[in-house]
A protein has these predicted regions:
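N-terminal Lys/Arg-rich, disordered targeting/topogenic segments
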Residues: 1-13
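Glutamate identity and glutamate-enriched acidic tracts
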Residues: 3, 50, 73, 87, ...
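Intrinsic low-complexity, intrinsically disordered segments enriched in polar/basic residues
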Residues: 3-6, 60, 201
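Short amphipathic alpha-helical "recognition" segments used for binding
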Residues: 7-10, 38, 44-46, 216
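N-terminal amphipathic, basic helical "cap/leader" segment at the start of enzyme domains
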Residues: 15-177
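Small-aliphatic-rich amphipathic alpha-helix that forms the alpha element of a beta-alpha
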Residues: 79, 98, 125, 179-190, ...
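Short, charged, solvent-exposed linker or helix-capping segments at domain edges/interfaces
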Residues: 137, 192-193
Length: 239
């Protein structure tokens, strides 16, 4: 595992962009609320059915650690934004720990690491794997579980996505990062928790909760991280 480098001195759909998060050194994360892309599936039902067979096969992640030598106070004190990467591949343990920090299930009733208004939990994390030991390149959905802890990945799209991920935010760092995480939010799910009244601000707030959790987790793991809110929505949909 690479060591952390010292840093120099009105939405129209239920799913919309929120935030971009990058993990640097040996991990990068993107946080988004992503647009739905169901129209593509309708164009080729047969191909969609074939993809579903691939999607439903879960990959179990290593059990997350519940303690470390770094206190919360120490992580907050030393947390800094970083923008440089090493070429070292990530491990499944590191990636799983970061995903768990963002949206891991911590209670049998579905409670997660990040709080949610009325326990709606509208966020979903997606991982773009570029250089992770034991994991093929592609886009994966994180499955934390609902009323039981699952902590799994499911393949959504295979292949090298470095270029398109980098283009979506206009930064080369995204192309070089071993891993990218999208934070997505379901606005309709949150609205249902409020008697079908839109409450998008809570989704944005929760994306911030998840991002901060990952910031502190990255610090504890000796990884760097940067959050970014600027991205090209149309290119994000292509991922």
């Amino acid at each position: 595992m690479a060591k952390k480098k010292k840093s120099p001195s009105t939405p129209t759909r239920s799913l919309i962009p929120i935030l971009t998060v990058l993990f640097v050194i040996s991990l990068s994360l993107f946080a988004y609320v992503k647009w739905a892309t169901t129209n593509k599936a309708k164009l080729n039902p047969q191909k969609t059915q074939e993809n579903l067979v691939q999607v439903v096969k879960p990959i179990n992640l290593p059990k997350p650690s519940l303690s470390s030598r770094t206190s919360v106070e120490s992580a907050m004190q030393s947390r800094r934004t970083a923008r440089n990467f090493t070429e070292t591949a990530l491990t499944m343990k590191l990636v799983g720990q970061m995903l768990w920090a963002g949206q891991g299930v911590t209670a049998d009733w579905g409670g997660r690491t990040a709080p949610s208004a009325k326990s709606a939990y509208p966020l979903t994390l997606y991982l773009v794997a570029n250089k992770i030991d034991g994991l093929d390149s592609g886009l994966y959905k994180y499955i934390p579980g609902e009323h039981q802890i699952l902590h799994q990945l499911v393949l959504v799209k295979s292949g090298d996505l470095k270029a398109i991920t980098g283009d979506s935010v206009g930064q080369n760092a995204a192309k070089e990062a071993p891993a990218v995480i999208f934070i997505t939010g379901d606005m309709e799910k949150m609205a249902k928790a409020f008697d079908d009244k839109r409450n998008d601000n809570n989704v944005y707030l929760e994306a911030g909760h998840a991002a901060q959790n990952m910031y502190l987790q990255a610090e504890s793991l000796g990884l760097g991280m940067v959050t970014m809110a600027g991205f090209n929505g149309e290119k994000v949909k292509e991922v």
